[in-house]
Swiss-Prot record:
It comes from Leptothrix cholodnii (strain ATCC 51168 / LMG 8142 / SP-6). It catalyses: tRNA(Gly) + glycine + ATP = glycyl-tRNA(Gly) + AMP + diphosphate. PROSITE patterns: AA_TRNA_LIGASE_II_GLYAB. The gene is glyS. This is Glycine--tRNA ligase beta subunit. It is found in: Cytoplasm.
Length: 713
C-alpha cells in the first residue's frame, strides 16, 4: 500500500548565508533519518531538501500514518533471581513486570534462554508503532537539535514570557501529510498549512498549501520564491551565463560566491552593471576580490580572461524599471574601487626593499621570531637548494641566463622581498592578495627578470589543483618557503592533530611533494631537510625523522587519490625513495610489471625470500661462490641471474624502471625450480650460506624499483 508524502517547513527570519546550504541538508537529512529509524518512512524514501534565506523544508515520499507494531524481547533477570525454589515469581520479578506494564499472569509464558552468563527470563511483548504525530515530533526535535549552528540567539515568544534559542527567530511551521496537517509543535509554533512567500513580490500575503506535493509549485507561482537551493542556484547560473553572453563576455567562475548568493536571494534576477574604465589600471585581482568579497558581484571577463569594466549583480527583486537597482549598485561599488586604487597608488610610493626593516616588527611565531628572521632563514634554505641542484647527479638545466650563481642571487633577492607586501595597505585590506601584490610592486620597480614572478608564485601551490611556480627562481623560493614553515613548526612541536591543522602543514607538505614530483627535480627529500635544519640554529629540536614520515604519509595519500592502489603505493614507498620525482615512473613500472603473467609468482617468491632472509642467523652477504653451487637448479638460477641482472641494473640506472622490472620476468622459471628442488637450509654451513647469498643477491636485484613482495596476494 502506498503512503502519502510528507512536507515539513520551518519559516524563519533571514538565515546566515554561508551556513544555509549545510543547514538545509542537515535539517532534511536528520528529520528523514529519524522517520526511517522509527519505521514511518521506508529506506527507499526520496528525501528532497529545500533551503532559502527564510525557510528550511523537507519533502519525504511514502510516509506512513502509523509505524507497524513490533515484537520486542525484554530481558528481565536471571532465573535464579526471578523464581524461588518452588518456581514461583519473586517480588523482584513482579516489580520488573509491573514496570513493563505486565503482571503475574504472564509468568508461565516467559521465555527461558541463556544470556551468555546464565539462564535468564525474557518477556516477549508487542509494542505499538508510533503515530506520525509522535514520530514527526521526535524527528523535528532531533533535526533542530542537530543543526550545525555555531551560535544561537535567544528571543521571546509572543506571550512575552517564554524565551527560546535558535539560529534566527522562527515565525511559522508547516507539516502536511498528503493534504492533512500533522499536529506537531516547536519553538512555540503549532504546525499548520500556511507559509509566506517573497517579502516584497509574493502574489498573496500567505500561501495556503493544498498538499505536501504542491509546496515548490505554489511557492513559485503564488509566493515568487524558488524554494530549492539547487534549483535556485541553477537558475542563477542560467541567468548569469545569458547576461554575460549578451555582452560577449563571461562571468567569473566561483562556486563559493555562487553558493553564498544563492543563499541571499529567493527570486534571483541578474542585472548588468558597470564602473568607470579608469579603475582597470588597478590590478584585476584587487578589483575582483573587492567586488566578490564586499559586494557579492560577479565580475565579467573578456575572451582572454582579462577583467572588463562590467559586472553582474543578482538582485532579489524584479522591478519593471531596474535602473534604480543598477544605479544603486554602481554607486555602492565605486568607493570600494576607489579605495583599492588609493591603496595601490600609496603602496607604490615605497619600494619593497625599503619595507624590509619593517619585517623585524612583524611577529611570525612566538618561538620562531619575526618575519624578518624568517626571511633570512628562507634565504639560507634557498641557497642550500641551489647548491643541491648544482651538485645533482642528474643534471638540472636552468635558463641560459640563469647560471647557478645568477639563480642563487635571484633567489636571495626574492626571498628577502617576498614577505614585504605584508606591510602594504592593499594586503592589509585583502590578506588573500599576499604574494600577488608583491609581484605587481616588484614589476613596477623594474626588478630583475624572474624575481617578480618568483615573489608572486612563492605561495604556490596554494590549494589542490593550483598551478606550480612558473620559473626556476620561483620554484626554489616556493620550496624554501614551505620547508621553512614545515621544519620550523615541526621543530617546536606544532604538529597537525586529527582535523586540526591551524598552520596548514598538510597543504605545505603536499606543495613540496607536488613541486618535487611534477617538476621532476633531481633533489632528495632527506637532503632538503638536512639543508633546511641548520637555518634555525638552536631555535628548534631536530624534526627530520617525524617530518620525513609525515611527508611520506602525505605522499601516500596523494598517490592513492590519483588512483594508484594501496599495494602499488606501498610497494614503491617501502623502499623510501629519496628522490620523489622518481615516484611516478616507479609506480608506472610496478603497474606494468603487475600485468605480466609472471608477476604473481615472482612477487610471492620475493615475499618468501624476504622471510627466509629475516630468519637467517647472522648477516647474510649478497655473494655467490660458483664452486658451492651443488644442485642443477641453483646453478641455473645463478646463471639466469648473472645474465639478467646486468641489463636490469643498467636499465634502472637509466631510469627505465618499467623495462628493468620486465627483464626480471625471465627469472620466474629458474626461481620456481630452485624452490622446488633445492633445500636452502642445508646441513652443510657453507652450502647454506652460499644459498642464502644467492637469495640475497636475487632479492636485491628484484627490489630496486619497488618492494615486489608488497604485490603478493
Amino acid at each position: 500500500m502506498s503512503h502519502p508524502n510528507l512536507l515539513v517547513e520551518l519559516f524563519v527570519e533571514e538565515l546566515p548565508p554561508k551556513a544555509l546550504k549545510k543547514l538545509g541538508e542537515s535539517f532534511a537529512g536528520t528529520l528523514a533519518a529519524s522517520l526511517k529509524a522509527g519505521g514511518l518512512a521506508g529506506a527507499d524514501a526520496v528525501v528532497t531538501p529545500f533551503a532559502s534565506p527564510r525557510r528550511l523544508a523537507v519533502h519525504v515520499t511514502g510516509v506512513a500514518a502509523k509505524a507497524a507494531d513490533k515484537s520486542v524481547l525484554h530481558k528481565l533477570m536471571p532465573v535464579a533471581v526471578a523464581l524461588d525454589a518452588a518456581g514461583n515469581a519473586t517480588p523482584a520479578l513482579l516489580k520488573k513486570l509491573a514496570a513493563l506494564g505486565a503482571d503475574a499472569s504472564v509468568v508461565p509464558s516467559l521465555k527461558r534462554q541463556p544470556d551468555g552468563k546464565a539462564e535468564a527470563l525474557f518477556l516477549d511483548s508487542q509494542v505499538a508503532g508510533a503515530t506520525l504525530a509522535e514520530g514527526l515530533q521526535k524527528a523535528l526535535d532531533d533535526a533542530l537539535a542537530k543543526l550545525p549552528i555555531p551560535k544561537v540567539m535567544g528571543y521571546q515568544l509572543a506571550d512575552g514570557w517564554t524565551s527560546v534559542n535558535f539560529v534566527r527567530p522562527a515565525h511559522g511551521l508547516v507539516a502536511l501529510h498528503g493534504d492533512d496537517v500533522v499536529p506537531v509543535a516547536t519553538l512555540g509554533l503549532v504546525a499548520g498549512r500556511s507559509t509566506h512567500g517573497h517579502r516584497f513580490e509574493a502574489a498573496v500575503p500567505t500561501v495556503e498549501l493544498r498538499h505536501a506535493d504542491s509546496y515548490a509549485e505554489q511557492l513559485e507561482t503564488e509566493g515568487a520564491v524558488i524554494a530549492g537551493f539547487e534549483a535556485r542556484r541553477a537558475e542563477i547560473v542560467r541567468q548569469l551565463d545569458a547576461a554575460a553572453a549578451a555582452q560577449g563576455l563571461k562571468p567569473i567562475d566561483d562556486d563559493a560566491l555562487l553558493d553564498e548568493v544563492t543563499a541571499l536571494v529567493e527570486r534571483p534576477n541578474v542585472l548588468v552593471c558597470q564602473f568607470e574604465p579608469e579603475f582597470l589600471a588597478v590590478p584585476q585581482e584587487c578589483l575582483i576580490l573587492t567586488m566578490k568579497a564586499n559586494q557579492k558581484y560577479f565580475p565579467l571577463l573578456d575572451a582572454a580572461g582579462k577583467l572588463t569594466h562590467k559586472f553582474l549583480i543578482v538582485s532579489n527583486i524584479r522591478p519593471d524599471d531596474a535602473s534604480a537597482v543598477i544605479g544603486g549598485n554602481e554607486r555602492v561599488v565605486r568607493p570600494r574601487l576607489a579605495d583599492a586604487k588609493f591603496f595601490f597608488d600609496q603602496d607604490r610610493k615605497k619600494t619593497l626593499e625599503s619595507r624590509v626593516p619593517g619585517l623585524a616588527r612583524v611577529v611570525y611565531h612566538g618561538k620562531l621570531g619575526t618575519q624578518g628572521e624568517r626571511a633570512e632563514r628562507v634565504r639560507a634554505i634557498g641557497h642550500a637548494i641551489v647548491n643541491q641542484l648544482r651538485m645533482a647527479t642528474i643534471p638540472y638545466t636552468v635558463d641560459a641566463q640563469d647560471e647557478f650563481a645568477v639563480l642563487d642571487s635571484k633567489v636571495q633577492q626574492a626571498a628577502l622581498l617576498a614577505k614585504t607586501d605584508l606591510l602594504t595597505d592593499m594586503v592589509g585590506e585583502f590578506p588573500e592578495l599576499q604574494g600577488i601584490m608583491g609581484g605587481y610592486y616588484a614589476r613596477h620597480e623594474g626588478l630583475r627578470d624572474g624575481v617578480a614572478i618568483a615573489i608572486e608564485d612563492h605561495y604556490k601551490p596554494r590549494f589542490a589543483g593550483d598551478a606550480l611556480p612558473r620559473n626556476h627562481t620561483g620554484t626554489v623560493l616556493a620550496l624554501a618557503d614551505k620547508l621553512e614553515t614545515l621544519v620550523g613548526l615541526f621543530g617546536i612541536g606544532q604538529l597537525p592533530t586529527g582535523d586540526r591543522d591551524p598552520f596548514a602543514l598538510r597543504r605545505h607538505a603536499l606543495g613540496v611533494i607536488r613541486i618535487l614530483v611534477e617538476k621532476n627535480l633531481p633533489l632528495d627529500l632527506p637532503a632538503l631537510l638536512n639543508g633546511a635544519v641548520p637555518a634555525f640554529g638552536e631555535l628548534i629540536e631536530d624534526p627530520r625523522l617525524a617530518l620525513f614520515d609525515f611527508m611520506r604519509d602525505r605522499l601516500a595519500v596523494n598517490l592513492r587519490d590519483q588512483g594508484y592502489s594501496a599495494q602499488e603505493v606501498d610497494a614503491v614507498l617501502a623502499l623510501e625513495p629519496a628522490r620523489l620525482g622518481d615516484v611516478p615512473k616507479r609506480l608506472a613500472a610496478v603497474r606494468a610489471f603487475a600485468a605480466l603473467p609472471e608477476a604473481a609468482a615472482l612477487a610471492a617468491a620475493n615475499k618468501r625470500i624476504g622471510n627466509i632472509l629475516k630468519k637467517a642467523e647472522g648477516t647474510v652477504e649478497a655473494r655467490i661462490d660458483a664452486a658451492l653451487l651443488a644442485e642443477p637448479a641453483e646453478q641455473q638460477l645463478a646463471a639466469a641471474l648473472a645474465q639478467v641482472q646486468p641489463g636490469a641494473d643498467a636499465l634502472f640506472a637509466q631510469g627505465e624502471y618499467a623495462a628493468s622490472l620486465q627483464a626480471l620476468a625471465a627469472l620466474k622459471a629458474p626461481v620456481d625450480a630452485f624452490f622446488d628442488d633445492v633445500m636452502v637450509n642445508a646441513e652443510d654451513p657453507a652450502l647454506r650460506a652460499n644459498r642464502l647469498g644467492l637469495l640475497a643477491t636475487l632479492h636485491g636485484a628484484m627490489n630496486r624499483v619497488a618492494e615486489l613482495a608488497r604485490l603478493a596476494a
